[in-house]
Amino acid sequence: RLMYWQVYLHKTVLSAEKPGEGNMNFTLRIKTNLRSFILKQSRGYVEKYPQVAAPENRAMMEAAFYDIIQDSATLSAKMPKLIGKDAVNNILMLEDLGEGSDFARLYKQGDTIDANALEEIIDFAATLHNAFDAKNFDNPIRNLEMRKLNHEHMFIYPYLKENGLNLDEILPGLRAVAAPFKQNELLKSKVAAMGVLYLADGDTLLHGDYFPGSWLQTNQGIRI
């Protein structure tokens, strides 16, 4: 695989390494004698949990997202540039944003985010939500298969009495805390109604993975 890219680029590949801990896709940082870039491949399963099936072409949905946001200088400046794509093998070639840290630290008790960073993150989501209307596109991104996967894990799986997940391994005592929520039928009916909305086609463009792990603090500022 490295030899293929070396011939294709007419450059010397110096190294290939994982840029971080990802869940969904197989990702590499490729360093050459001239630059570095990111390769991301989506396969027919969740990379971190191979037993979980996932839409194989999800990287191409992501590529379509990158193409659309190029019409917004504000949004495209906050995200890596899409350099190229291989639709046959579901591979994206992306700009390398460099070494940085994400905001997953916010899940730790006592950790915070400063007001300016929070405003940037909120502004990005608000701009994205208002900048595009599906009615203006011949083929708007629907990505229904990926939404079905997320729907199962957000609106169904957590509320099953026995879902095979040992919550106490995540945090001691969490199983007992979660039990009342799993037994609350009113809550579950409200969650189910939200799930129906989630699966419905809307008119706005959404980022499908907008959470602290996708917010990066880099030398160029916050990137998504």
Indicate residue ranges for each PLM-predicted region:
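Short helix-terminating capping/connector loops at secondary-structure junctions
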Residues: 8-10, 74-78, 199-200
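Juxta-kinase regulatory segment immediately upstream of eukaryotic protein kinase catalytic domains
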Residues: 1-16
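Structural motif corresponding to the C-terminal cap of alpha-helices
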Residues: 3, 73, 195-198
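Active-site catalytic-loop/activation-segment of kinase and kinase-like phosphoryl-transfer enzymes
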Residues: 141-194
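Short flexible/disordered coil segments
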Residues: 99, 137-161, 196-217
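ATP-binding pocket architecture of kinase catalytic cores
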Residues: 19, 29-140
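Short, conserved clusters of charged catalytic residues that mark active-site
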Residues: 11, 22, 61, 77, ...
